[in-house]
Amino acid sequence: MGDKIFHNLSGKTLVATPHAITKGIYHKSLIYMLSHTEEGAIGLIFNRLVNHIDLKSFFKIKNDEITTPVMVPIYLGGPVEHEKGFFLHSSDYNKNLLLDFQNDLAVSSNLEISEDIAFGKGPKNSLFIVGYTAWKPGQLEEELEKNLWLVMDCNKEFIFADNPESKWHNALKHLGIDEIHFSSQIGNA
C-alpha cells in the first residue's frame, strides 16, 4: 500500500455526517478549521450557542462611555481549554490578528477587539467562541476515512447566520444532502 496523500483542510468547514455522530458536542456540529497539518489539526465549532455575555463585564472593560451592557452570544468551540476565548470574524477588522485567512475571515484573541466591538468599531461580523477542537496527528484523517465528517468550502453566510440551530441543516442543503435519506451505511470506494 502506498503513502497516503495529505490534504490540508485549513480554512475549510467540517460538517458532522448525519447518523455517524449521534450524541455529544460533535452531533450536528460545524467546525471551521483553523489549522490542519501533518502534526494535527485545530478548529472551532461555530454552531453551539451556549449563552449570552456582557462584553464589558466579561472582559472587565473599564470605560465610562459604555453605560449599558453589550450583550453578545457565546459559542462553545470544542472540548479543549474552555478558559480561552476567540473571536472568529470578518477580515474587515485587522488589528492584532491571531490568524488571518485567504477567505475573508480572521481570528483574534485579545482585549482590544472586545473593546472595539463594545464601541461599535469592531468587525462587521464576529462570533465569540470559547474552547476549541483539536486532533492528534492522523486522528482527523481517520475520522474522515470513517465518514464522520463532510468537508465543504468556507461559507461566511453559514458561519455568521443569525440562527445557530439551522446552520447544520443549511450546510447539508448546500451540499445537496437530505438528512432523512442519508444512509448511515457509508463507505469509501
Curated annotation (Swiss-Prot):
Signal peptide: none annotated. One of its GO terms (cellular component) is cytosol. Gene3D superfamilies: VC0467-like. Belongs to the UPF0301 (AlgH) family. This is UPF0301 protein RF_0044.
